């Protein structure tokens, strides 16, 4: 074992980790950025929380890194309590050691299956964070029911992004009841949110995303729970299907029904709230969290202001129109000079969000080449 630091927290973790289910206790150092962002986003949610008690649950605790960082780093004037669970007795032992290391008394540890822990606490938690190895689907129903408190927050991660991005079409249909679209990584998180919205609606619960990102091998989202059939109906209205023709997307509402050639359903509404993003960015900066977490939050703070589902991949677009790829910064400059909004995206170095149409981009790239060459 070794002791490391993440954020403002000390953690005892395995000396070596294979990052697989074979590990005695699971700890992924590559997810420090994920945890930095998670603490920042939940802090932004907590800043607007107006009750005296704040109850959180991390039912898939592993080494306890996520839940312990919540317990140690979240600032709240009331009573903040965190429940951490894991089915693995070795993990439970390590979680307890990490609690002692940080001298925390606001955490309760459970040696229990995640679904059992969540099902025992129906309508109890203000925040449930599902961070599994693989897909969150096996835990989603229990997570929704456990976070049914008015204005609760459901956080979830999917590390099966190859499935969500279309590499395993049949698996996606089977697990998420949706047809994936290859290419744009943002659609992975939109597909995951769409599935969660459908699952929650059967309990007359609407889910409203307040922050989402796709980083490395995972998709991550934070969704506020809104009670009532009307809220569920409103959430469903944000679902729809996408058809990709060359570089152009066509859309159909969920209510219109599936049509051959389309993919989805995806969540087509806003997936990150500008105020939450900005507050999360300030939190990450003020606490000296990892530079990478700050960089991701800064990009999302810009891209979330542009209403576009997915992005334009300049590399793919130039390949399609048989042009050399200009510097992305030059394209951005030309778009701005022509009155368009534009931003890089956090998940693709060649990706741009813009209110320009595909035809506008083609013209600007062609004009760039005619002037340059």
Curated annotation (Swiss-Prot):
Q: Which GO terms describe its biological process?
A: tRNA N2-guanine methylation
HAMAP family reported in the protein's UniProt record: tRNA_dimethyltr_TRM1
| Entry-linked Gene3D superfamilies | N2,N2-dimethylguanosine tRNA methyltransferase, C-terminal domain (3.30.56.70), Vaccinia Virus protein VP39 (3.40.50.150)
Q: Which residues bind S-adenosyl-L-methionine?
A: 35, 66, 86, 113-114
Q: Which InterPro entries match?
A: SAM-dependent_MTases_sf, Trm1, TRM1_arc_bac, tRNA_met_Trm1_C
Q: Which residues form the Trm1 methyltransferase domain?
A: 2-365
Q: Does the keyword Cytoplasm apply?
A: no
What PROSITE patterns does the record point to? SAM_MT_TRM1
**Keyword annotations for this protein?**
Methyltransferase, RNA-binding, S-adenosyl-L-methionine, Transferase, tRNA processing, tRNA-binding
Function, as annotated, reads:
Dimethylates a single guanine residue at position 26 of a number of tRNAs using S-adenosyl-L-methionine as donor of the methyl groups.
Q: What is its EC number?
A: 2.1.1.216
The reaction(s) annotated as catalysed by this protein in its Swiss-Prot or TrEMBL entry are: guanosine(26) in tRNA + 2 S-adenosyl-L-methionine = N(2)-dimethylguanosine(26) in tRNA + 2 S-adenosyl-L-homocysteine + 2 H(+)
EC class, as a word, reads: transferase
Molecular function (GO) terms for this protein are: tRNA (guanine(26)-N2)-dimethyltransferase activity; tRNA binding
Q: Which organism is it from?
A: Methanococcus maripaludis (strain C6 / ATCC BAA-1332)
| Sequence similarity | Belongs to the class I-like SAM-binding methyltransferase superfamily. Trm1 family.
NCBIfam families recorded for this chain?
Answer: TRM1
- By what name is this protein known? tRNA (guanine(26)-N(2))-dimethyltransferase
């Amino acid at each position: 074992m070794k002791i490391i630091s993440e954020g403002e927290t000390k953690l005892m973790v395995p000396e070596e980790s294979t990052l697989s289910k074979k590990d005695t206790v699971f700890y992924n150092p590559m997810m420090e950025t994920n945890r930095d962002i998670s603490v920042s986003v939940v802090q932004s949610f907590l800043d607007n929380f107006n009750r005296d008690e704040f109850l959180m649950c991390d039912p898939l605790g592993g080494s306890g890194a996520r839940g312990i960082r919540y317990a140690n780093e979240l600032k709240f004037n009331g009573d903040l309590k965190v429940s951490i669970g894991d089915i693995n007795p070795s993990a439970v032992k390590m979680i307890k050691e990490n609690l002692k290391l940080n001298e925390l008394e606001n955490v309760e540890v459970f040696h229990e299956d995640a679904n059992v822990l969540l099902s025992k606490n129906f309508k109890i938690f203000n925040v449930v964070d599902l961070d599994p190895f693989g897909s969150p689907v096996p835990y989603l129903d229990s997570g929704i029911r456990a976070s049914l408190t008015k204005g609760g927050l459901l956080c979830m991660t999917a590390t099966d992004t190859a499935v969500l991005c279309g590499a395993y079409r049949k698996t996606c249909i089977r697990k998420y009841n949706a047809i994936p679209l290859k290419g744009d990584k943002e659609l992975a998180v939109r597909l995951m949110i769409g599935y969660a919205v459908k699952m929650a609606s059967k309990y007359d619960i609407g889910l409203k995303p307040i922050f989402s990102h796709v980083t490395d091998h995972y998709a991550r989202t934070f969704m506020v729970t809104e009670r009532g059939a009307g809220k569920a109906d409103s959430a469903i209205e944000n679902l729809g299907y996408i058809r990709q023709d060359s570089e152009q997307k066509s859309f159909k509402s969920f209510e219109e029904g599936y049509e051959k050639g389309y993919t989805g359903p995806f969540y087509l509404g806003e997936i990150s709230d500008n105020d939450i993003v900005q507050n999360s960015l300030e939190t990450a900066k003020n606490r000296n969290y990892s530079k990478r977490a700050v960089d991701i939050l800064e990009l999302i703070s810009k891209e979330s202001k542009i209403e576009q589902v997915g992005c334009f991949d300049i590399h793919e677009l130039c390949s399609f129109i048989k042009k050399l790829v200009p510097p992305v910064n030059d394209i951005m400059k030309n778009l701005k000079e022509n009155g368009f909004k534009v931003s890089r995206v956090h998940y693709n170095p060649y990706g741009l969000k813009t209110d320009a149409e595909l035809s506008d981009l083609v013209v600007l790239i062609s004009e760039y080449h005619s002037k340059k060459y």
